[in-house]
A protein has these predicted regions:
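Terminal transmembrane helical anchor/hairpin motif
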Residues: 1-4, 116, 123-180
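Secretory targeting signals
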Residues: 1-7, 54, 58-121
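Residue-level signature of transmembrane alpha-helical cores of multipass secondary-active transporters
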Residues: 8, 23-24, 95-99, 155, ...
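Long, hydrophobic alpha-helical segments
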Residues: 8-31
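Residue-level signal for the membrane-embedded core of alpha-helical transmembrane segments
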Residues: 13-21, 64, 68, 100, ...
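Hydrophobic/aromatic residues in alpha-helical transmembrane segments
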Residues: 21-25, 37, 73, 108-109, ...
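Helix-loop-helix units of permease transmembrane domains in multi-pass membrane transporters
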Residues: 28-58
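Transmembrane helix-loop junction
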Residues: 31, 43, 75-79, 115, ...
């Protein structure tokens, strides 16, 4: 196409992202249950949905921060390209957008897995495997569509729906923690 390519980065990034999200979310609820601080947190006058959403947002923001080195990669390729600046910025922007949406879904699934167990290791393994299966079966097509530069509203709605569904189910499960 005559442009410097950054495709390799965006082909491997989802596989790394599913592990990063599983690692960031494994402690969200599993550690609280394991240490017994979940009941103390629930005794505070804070709505359950606020606790879950804030935990999700904290992990999601950290995941997005973890994506910032990709921007550094863009500028390196930008300045190293012949002639300088000969890189498809639209494809890069679409790919970054795809990674942000993918991280929203992976973070939600990882948080959901953390609500299911009291062990951080089990939460990590369950989150990584769930993210892998979800990516392989469903998310890969939506992600590859966005990385080609085609930002379809259906893809965006799908990623947001996965994240919201995971948050809602996490709220329902978190409400049952300690009542067993």
């Amino acid at each position: 196409s005559g442009y410097a390519q950054v495709d390799g980065l965006f082909q491997i990034a989802p596989w790394l992202l599913m592990l990063v999200c599983a690692a960031l979310t494994m402690r969200l609820f599993a550690e609280e249950k394991q240490s017994g601080t979940w009941l103390l947190l629930r005794a505070q006058p804070i709505a359950l949905w606020k606790i879950v959403v804030c935990k999700y947002l904290a992990a999601f923001v950290l995941t997005v921060i973890a994506l910032l080195p990709c921007v550094v990669h863009y500028f390196i390729v930008f300045y190293m390209a012949e002639p300088m600046g000969n890189i498809d910025g639209g494809q890069f922007a679409g790919s970054m957008m795809g990674l942000v949406f993918l991280s929203a879904s992976f973070t939600g699934i990882g948080m959901l897995c953390s609500t299911l167990t009291g062990s951080q290791l089990v939460a990590f393994i369950l989150g990584a495997v769930s993210n892998f299966v979800l990516y392989w079966v469903v998310l890969q097509d939506h992600y590859s569509s966005i990385t080609r530069g085609v930002v379809d509203l259906r893809d965006v709605v799908f990623f947001v729906s996965v994240a919201v569904a995971a948050i809602v189910v996490s709220i329902l499960i978190a409400g049952r923690i300690g009542k067993r």
